[in-house]
Amino acid sequence: MTVARFPSLAHWGAFTALVENGRVIGCEPFARDPAPSNMLEAIPDMVHSPLRIARPAIREGWREGKARTGTERFHEVSWDEALDAVAAELARVRETFGNTAILGGSYGWSSAGRVHHARSLVRRFLFLGGGCVDQVGNYSFGAAQYLLPRVIGTFQPAVGQITDWSSIVKHTRLVLAFGGLAIKNGQVTSGGAGTHSMETWLRRAKDAGIEFVSISPLKSDAPDFLGAQWVPIRPNTDTALMLAMAHTLLSEERYDASFVARYCTGFEAFRRYLLGLDDNVPKDAQWAEAITGVAADAIRELARRAAATRSMITCAWSLQRAHHGEQPYWAAIVLAAMLGGIGLPGGGFAFGHGSSNGIGVPRVDVAGPEVPLPLNPARSMIPVARMADMLLHPDDSYEFNGRRYSYPDIRLVYWAGGNPFHHHQDLNRLQRAWQKPETVIVHDSWWTPTARHADIVLPATTTLERNDVGGSSRDSFVLAMHRAIDPIGGARNDFDIFRALARRLGYETAFTEDRDEMGWCQWVYDQVRASATAKGVALPGFQQFWAEGFVEMPPPERDYVLFEDFRRDPERHPLKTPSGRIEIVSDAVAGFDYADCPSHPAWLPPAEWLGSASAQHWPTPARLPAATRRSRRCSGKTASLWLIPSTRWSRPPRSSILRRCRRATAW
């Protein structure tokens, strides 16, 4: 039988689905991709997995209020019965408790396609129905998202708007990579990509003679071909190392005093902190050695090398996914400011290298495809990481970004396309919190832990069972995603599910805007095309794009250098901070009066690290880097436990310890 071919896209890259007799039999990587991810090989098994949800199902014991343990039986029902139950429950909660009793943030990565992007659709549906409690921030770079605007006036450098790799290759001589440059992490980007270029750019940088230093607990966080100097560091101590480097620059008069004076505010208070003038603790290399495990002489030499040439300081997202995660990013900015390279080609700081595909890749700044999101009439939100706190402690107050809020009393959770039982912290606590709502509704394609802990489960199609348009703001391609097979079982796409619910609740036209699936595919592409036109880039019409399967943006005419305009003229191009400068000391943060985030970068010992009292009983830290062959859901077997030799290793692990690792809390 003839094999049919359909262009498509996943978060780990573009591909062509190969279909025979209605079944996906393989995935052929996109021809333009120099380094396609081998995770594409798993797609046929995922689509045809025995864990697929075949039909709508309702949990036994839901109406009686029995606990959600993840082990109850589900009874399959018709789509009409399931949709009627969902619509009735939404109406009941809205009428009885108000829209702020519904949690609808639905954080998750279900689709690289933007029309069927589940989180966008569930929020659009709930916002148009009166609103809900939304989620803000993210698990990827949430600390940076709210710190960086206080320090440099924008969080865009955290999501990839940083000095281009092309500028680095031409001008940088030394890259200090805190958290390393793990190529395996470059397999994935939200929204997918036409090319995986991280290895390409690293090889170009190496060929250009750039020296690399990888500062990470794992040597494997930098590829062998870089020949990077490895500086093994105790986990969660990067801030102390950066402060000691800053102290070396200051005490040896190697820092750029003129840059600091013109482009920064608050240096004097930070200088006093570095020198220990107020606490009698100089933050020098000897001090940092005791914390980081990096020799004092090595710390001083790193600082001297960075000051002697054009240097780029880059930090992986992992640094700020930890207790006091604001501090290493703030310290990196201040260290880069003292080196004086901010705003110069190949100099300054960057975030996200080694964390995701597309970071720093030269690209015309054209908007990516997305479905429009209306305002949330409920005007209510929580930080994503506080979900369990909210469910367990309704009406309690909490502090966030300098303001005091109260947790809403959630009666209904609506989750589409995500799996919080994978990515939330302290899963045992989350399971307790998950018992609090009266109803949990989930859309998913597989029986994930979240689906098994739901009351009403609606089976959603996978990417290959619907049409879509995908692409990332970090990539130069916009890609057509053709439906390759019929929906499996009774699955429906999220758009059609929400359209049917909106019809039952009286706002179908507002939700669809009289567009069907293909109408929305054309609409989101046309928005990209209009954005490209405004930047002087001509793209073909939708029909040609759909037939050819992709369009590619041309490369930019010149390299992008972060804060280049600001450096050239800080008066005409001030930063969006209160001072218009880089805020080494933030009066706004000082005004928050947070014990765990002072007004300037500082060393704050984490709750868990090798220097804490608990390390006397638990001397072996657990590192949980992203897996090499799977993304962020549940597909794939549990990875083996690596035991790294160390002078701190005092006894072999007991089997009971290894068993407990499976239930450990992850930061």
Model-predicted segments: where are they?
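Short coil/turn segments at secondary-structure boundaries
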Residues: F97-Y107, Q135-F141, A257-C264, E301-A303, ...
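A cross-kingdom feature strongest in bacterial/archaeal respiratory oxidoreductases
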Residues: M1-E41, A101, R173-V175, G180-L226, ...
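Conserved active-site and cofactor/substrate-binding residues in soluble primary-metabolism enzymes
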Residues: H48, V77, E81, H116, ...
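N-terminal export/assembly segments and adjacent metallocofactor-ligating motifs
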Residues: M1-R254, A295, A588, C597, ...
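Acidic catalytic cores of enzymes that act on phosphate-bearing nucleotides/polynucleotides
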Residues: T309-G402
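Conserved short loop/turn motifs at secondary-structure junctions
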Residues: G105-G113, W287-I291, A316-H324, S355-S356, ...
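N-terminal leader/propeptide and maturation segments of large enzyme subunits in energy/redox metabolism
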Residues: W62-E81, H247, R254-A296, A484-D587
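Generic, well-ordered alpha-helical scaffold segments in large soluble proteins
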Residues: A85, E89-T96, R124-C132, F178, ...
